[in-house]
Amino acid sequence: MRLHSLILLSFLLLATQAFSEKVRKRAKNAPHSTAEEGVEGSAPSLGKAQNKQRSRTSKSLTHGKFVTKDQATCRWAVTEEEQGISLKVQCTQADQEFSCVFAGDPTDCLKHDKDQIYWKQVARTLRKQKNICRNAKSVLKTRVCRKRFPESNLKLVNPNARGNTKPRKEKAEVSAREHNKVQEAVSTEPNRVKEDITLNPAATQTMAIRDPECLEDPDVLNQRKTALEFCGESWSSICTFFLNMLQATSC
């Protein structure tokens, strides 16, 4: 009876020890599994965050301002098309406004996480341009894409002699106004002189000194000198006439 009790007790001890080992192993494995589950669950969220950040960066890099080597102040912005993109440039230079469009397809290049480098190199190429929008052979090339992806080069698609050129409205209106005023002044001045001469026939008689003795008359000489000083050669005869009317002389 005593032997039977000892055997039963030993079996109970072995079972207890085995159970405790299982519990200990589960406790060790539990943190690893929860950590792995946490990593697996957070992986999609991290991917979404990276994609959002990348899209924001791309949008901020696809527009901007620049000044070319020949001092044209410009803005540029990118628009997505069905196939590729279009890059519109709007510039102001020497009181003229003009614009043009470059087009290409950098989609395959941008798939390799090169969008930041690509757009920075595009902006640098724009700043190096001369006669922008005027050269039909203009191509915006980038080092990062041009060898493996030649379709990523942006070519000028609407070249003109000066792009879509428009004069600035304010300055054009002012210059036209000034031109009209000058033309009116030039056209009316000769008519005024003719009217003065035709309305006053005595002027021609007075200006043509009939008596040679009048040439030596001090009053006449003084009038001619005063007219030359204040009116100049072109208007001296008319001024002499008015002085002769105001100052009665023997001639």
Swiss-Prot record:
Recorded superkingdom: Eukaryota
UniProt KW keywords: Cell membrane, Disulfide bond, Glycoprotein, Growth factor binding, Membrane, Secreted, Signal
GO BP annotations listed: fibroblast growth factor receptor signaling pathway; myoblast proliferation; positive regulation of blood vessel endothelial cell proliferation involved in sprouting angiogenesis; positive regulation of cell migration involved in sprouting angiogenesis; positive regulation of fibroblast growth factor receptor signaling pathway; positive regulation of myoblast proliferation
Membrane topology summary: Peripheral membrane protein
Endpoints of the signal sequence: 1-20
Tissue specificity of this protein: Expressed in intestine, ovary, lung, placenta and normal and wounded skin.
Subunit structure: Found in a complex with FGFBP1, FGF1 and FGF2. Interacts with FGF1, FGF7, FGF10, FGF22 and HSPG2. Interacts with FGF2.
PANTHER family in the cross-refs: FGF BINDING PROTEIN-RELATED, FIBROBLAST GROWTH FACTOR-BINDING PROTEIN 1
Protein name: Fibroblast growth factor-binding protein 1
